[in-house]
A protein has these predicted regions:
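Switch I (G2) and immediately adjacent beta-strands of P-loop GTPase domains
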Residues: 52-73, 253-281, 297-302
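A glycine-rich (often HGG/GG-containing) alpha/beta subdomain
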Residues: 1-146, 150, 154, 328-331
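Inter-motif core of Ras-like GTPase G domains
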Residues: 286-310
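C-terminal-of-GTPase-core extension/linker across diverse P-loop GTPases
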Residues: 2-8, 12, 142-264, 281-283, ...
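Structural motif
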Residues: 89, 307-310, 336-337
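Generic enzyme active-site microenvironment
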Residues: 272, 306, 333
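Short glycine-/small-residue-rich Rossmann-like dinucleotide-binding loops
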Residues: 241, 276-277, 301, 308, ...
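Short alpha-helix of the ABC ATPase nucleotide-binding domain corresponding to the H-loop/switch region
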Residues: 278, 286-290, 318
Length: 463
């Protein structure tokens, strides 16, 4: 991190304002090469974070635009390094020319997420907070934004640190027993240690229970459209999405792969997945599509079983219904209400033991679509009560966090069982160490380059 990096921090395209960011040794001097203040004070001499008005220059020193600039010095900047920021009009050409001038002044192009990665490496934020930055940038609903904001303040980190501290106390006891065998130390203190381990296991288990809610808030509800070929699944996807996302033809089997679209209804995010009709086929391409459809079903939070309301419910529909009910919460959608012969589904008592909600509509005309949307919102409210109303809510929001907490909980449970069985302190120590290492991966106490790189690969350039 001894080099100077620079990047455009605003999104590509024309805009009212464009921002360039620098971080690293000599950031103020490099920025001064491309910025001429209106007053007599040079940019490197300006007080910390004081905005100066002036002219932005190209490599040849020719004026390009007027704008603002400021310097933020270490260790009080976002990255923990000396940083500078230049603000001008959002012309892609002007931004490109100024960036070229910064490269000529000794900076290099920043990699995606490198500014936030430097903040992490300088201890300005931990891994969970770094993930919250990109979660906040990518948030598609108010609930997701509030959740990311809460994690950015370090709420989850503090909970993890408290558990880590409790395990440290247990570790300290066993280390003392092993390091000072001549001292009069009770190697087990079974009651106190068992209570300490149980408290941390309960805290970890409580966190694990938040993982589904966190995923639903940050990624949305996965809503899979299932049904026979030509039941109108693709038409329904397009109707819900509000645009032609999937190809629609009268030919059964048109959809050969899963097609996805996202839609927000009353603040809830739904990830709609249109599937290939589940049927036996000799076509190898269609077989791949069916396999992906089955994979989508395994990940479903809600299934919309789409049926042709102009036809009687047959064995194939009943088989799909049984399959859907075994996988997830299911809603029956009777499509094609605009066509002659449309009727309500009839089930014999033995067909299903479940109480089903049925919505009738026409995906083609949109008639009745609002009733389906209302039902989707009700299902989301049941899964996510009071979604995102508290920014301080502690939730695990991704698979990395969930896996780390699960490994920690399993290690603590093993340590508790070993303590009951009276195993040697060094064996207990191994389980506690593994739990602490897993928690360390969450916050960054345990630095693994593969984990760090994976997190920051999600970022855009300039952040």
């Amino acid at each position: 991190m001894s080099d100077l990096i620079a990047a455009v921090a605003t999104p590509p395209g024309t805009g009212g304002v464009g921002i360039l960011r620098l971080s690293g040794p000599g950031a103020a001097q490099a920025a001064a090469r491309v910025f001429r203040p209106k007053g007599t004070r040079a940019l490197p001499d300006a007080p910390d974070r004081q905005l100066l008005y002036g002219t932005l220059l190209d490599q040849a020193g020719q004026a390009l635009d007027t704008g603002l600039a400021f310097v933020s010095r270490a260790p009080h900047s976002y990255t923990g390094e000396e940083t500078a920021e230049l603000q001008c009009h959002g012309s892609p050409m002007v931004l490109s020319l100024v960036l070229d001038a910064l490269f000529a002044a000794g900076a290099r192009q920043a990699r995606a997420g490198e500014f936030t990665q430097r903040a992490f490496l300088h201890g300005k934020l931990d891994r969970t907070q770094a993930e919250a930055v990109i979660d906040l940038i990518e948030a598609e609903t108010p609930a997701a934004a509030r959740q990311a904001a809460g994690q950015l303040t370090g709420a989850l980190s503090r909970r993890i640190d408290a558990i880590y501290s409790g395990l440290t106390d247990v570790m300290a006891h066993f280390c003392a027993v092993l390091d000072y065998p001549d001292e009069d130390l009770d190697p087990f203190q079974t009651q106190q240690l068992q209570e300490a381990l149980q408290a941390q296991e309960e805290a970890l288990t409580a966190l694990l229970r938040t993982s589904r809610r966190g995923r639903l808030l940050s990624q949305g509800l996965t809503c899979v459209l299932l049904g026979r070929p030509n039941a109108g699944k693709s038409s329904l996807l397009n109707a819900l999405a509000g645009y032609e996302r999937a190809i629609v033809t009268p030919i059964p089997g048109t959809t050969r792969d899963t097609v996805e679209a996202t839609v927000t209804l009353e603040g809830y995010l739904f990830r709609l997945v249109d599937t290939a009709g589940l049927r036996d086929s000799d076509d190898p391409i269609e077989q791949l599509g069916v396999a992906r459809s089955r994979q989508a079903l395994d990940q479903a939070d809600l299934i919309l079983l789409v049926c042709d309301g102009t036809q009687e419910m047959g064995e194939e529909d009943t088989a799909l219904l049984d399959q859907a009910l075994d996988q997830a919460d299911t809603l029956l959608v009777m499509n094609k209400s605009d066509l002659p012969g449309y009727g309500c589904p009839m089930f014999r008592a033995e067909d299903t033991a479940h109480t089903l909600s049925v919505v009738g509509l026409s995906a083609k005309t949109g008639l009745g679509l609002e009733f389906l949307e209302e039902e989707l919102v009700r299902r989301a409210q049941a899964l996510l009560p009071q979604a995102g109303q508290r920014a301080s809510e502690l939730l695990l929001t991704n698979q990395r966090q969930t896996d780390a907490v699960r490994r920690a909980a399993e290690s603590v449970a093993r340590a508790g069982q070993a303590l009951e069985q009276g195993v040697t302190p060094d064996a207990l120590l191994t389980d506690v160490e593994q739990a602490m290492a897993a928690l360390g991966e969450l916050t960054g106490r345990t630095v693994r380059e593969d984990i760090t790189s994976r997190i920051f690969q999600r970022f855009c350039v300039g952040k």
